């Protein structure tokens, strides 16, 4: 799994730490001011993609190309499961990215695994377990999982 976190002017959205932790510390920061963000002890590997101001269609196009052509040198770990924080920009970017990748989208997940996605429905009164049969894109609710601590400075790559 890999987290994709939309960034505006070096500001991380709510749910960033949850998404990074869910993806074992592997994260792609995309947007403006990504070079100014320090994820020491919060991530294992960080890929920086400075695409400037928010343009969802352009971001989705660039990210899909990166994910589709990725190997472990560019993006560490598996890119079969792409996780975004369920924040405003994440909710906008996720469907555009899922469409570009030709993958299903699971919005508002409360927990993720390689073979299952738990989503809240009916105003949070119901929890549904879904079993994806392949690669997918999901948004993860903020505050559900919490942060994880990774020792030291992450490995940082610029694309």
Question: Where are the regions a protein language model picked out?
Answer:
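N-terminal glycine-rich FAD/FM-binding segment characteristic of electron-transfer flavoproteins
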Residues: 1-159
């Amino acid at each position: 799994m890999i987290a994709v976190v939309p960034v505006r002017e070096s500001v991380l959205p709510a749910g960033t730490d949850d998404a990074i932790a869910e993806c074992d510390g592997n994260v792609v920061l995309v947007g403006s001011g990504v070079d100014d963000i320090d994820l020491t002890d919060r991530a294992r590997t960080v890929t920086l993609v400075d695409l400037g101001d928010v343009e969802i269609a352009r971001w989705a196009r660039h990210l899909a190309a990166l994910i589709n052509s990725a190997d472990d040198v560019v993006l560490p770990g598996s890119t079969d499961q792409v996780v975004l924080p369920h924040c405003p920009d994440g909710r906008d970017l996720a469907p555009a990215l899922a469409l570009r990748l030709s993958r299903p989208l699971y919005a508002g997940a409360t927990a993720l695994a390689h073979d299952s996605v738990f989503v809240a429905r009916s105003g949070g009164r119901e929890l549904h377990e879904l079993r994806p049969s392949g690669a997918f894109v999901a948004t993860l609710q903020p505050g559900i999982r919490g942060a994880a601590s990774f020792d030291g400075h992450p490995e940082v790559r610029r694309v």
